[in-house]
Amino acid sequence: MKIKTLAIVVLSALSLSSTAALADTTPTTVNGGTVHFKGEVVNAACAVDAGSVDQTVQLGQVRTATLKQAGATSSAVGFNIQLNDCDTTVATKAAVAFLGTAIDSTHPKVLALQSSAAGSATNVGVQILDRTGNELTLDGATFSAETTLNNGTNTIPFQARYFATGAATPGAANADATFKVQYQ
């Protein structure tokens, strides 16, 4: 009896495994998504590093007490624009210009903050300073101090800081600027 039961169990298991082996093994293909490839081929002395093209500078949290009156600034935070594959037989100097919306006509060197659904800070914007500490006009035509290029990789340092146009109120304090590089 035990042998008969064992034989039935073994035969049942074998029939199940053969059924699974005969199951449909046709592969299934589904749409996955889109991959975007972005870049640019340039005829210039250098190529802007991909990490510099679309970067975020973290200015962090700053107390309203630090920005309580017009002209007050936060501590500056450094950031860089890296140039790769530079060829000094093409150009020996580089400078950068930033373009963004100024907070108002009396402050052309202060970026306006973006609107935020959660509420934006007021009476404050963002300044960009070049390696010499000069505040840059955000018109896309006023360039930073020139940097002498070396063959290969070059780094152009900048700083950003909050600038109060009055007593700052709390809220999100984000701003955007684009940049372009001029080679000479």
Swiss-Prot record:
The lineage of its organism: Bacteria, Pseudomonadati, Pseudomonadota, Gammaproteobacteria, Enterobacterales. It comes from the Bacteria. Belongs to the fimbrial protein family. Keywords: Disulfide bond, Fimbrium, Signal. Residues 1-23 form the signal peptide. SUPFAM superfamilies: Bacterial adhesins. Gene3D superfamilies: Fimbrial-type adhesion domain (2.60.40.1090). This is Type-1 fimbrial protein, A chain. It is found in: Fimbrium.
